[in-house]
């Protein structure tokens, strides 16, 4: 993931792609937390960006679940 994925970019993704992004972001967050705990993390702002990306993905998934927003088929 780039430094802070935009919601508009995420809205273009399908459900499976969104789940893949979520798994990727969670794995990155785990690695960043591990680096922070061992004192190896240089960019602490990245932790915040990844957490916000995860929140954006969960928000979009919930919107789709409630029918607020649907997947735009390309």
UniProtKB/Swiss-Prot annotation:
Q: Which keywords has UniProt assigned to this entry?
A: Ribonucleoprotein, Ribosomal protein
Keyword Cell division part of the UniProt annotation: no
Any single GO CC term annotated in Swiss-Prot or TrEMBL for this entry: cytosolic large ribosomal subunit
Q: Give the molecular function GO annotations.
A: structural constituent of ribosome
Keyword Ribosomal protein listed? The answer is: yes
InterPro entries membership? Ribosomal_protein_uL29 (IPR050063), Ribosomal_uL29 (IPR001854), Ribosomal_uL29_CS (IPR018254), Ribosomal_uL29_sf (IPR036049)
Q: Name one GO biological process term.
A: translation
Q: What is this protein called?
A: Large ribosomal subunit protein uL29
Q: Which organism is it from?
A: Streptomyces avermitilis (strain ATCC 31267 / DSM 46492 / JCM 5070 / NBRC 14893 / NCIMB 12804 / NRRL 8165 / MA-4680)
């Amino acid at each position: 993931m780039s430094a802070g994925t935009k919601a508009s970019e995420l809205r273009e993704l399908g459900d499976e792609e969104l789940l893949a992004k979520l798994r990727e972001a969670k794995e990155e967050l785990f690695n960043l937390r591990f680096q922070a705990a061992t004192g190896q993390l240089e960019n602490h702002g990245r932790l915040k960006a990844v957490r916000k990306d995860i929140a954006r993905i969960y928000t979009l998934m919930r919107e789709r679940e409630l029918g607020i927003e649907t997947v735009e088929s390309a």
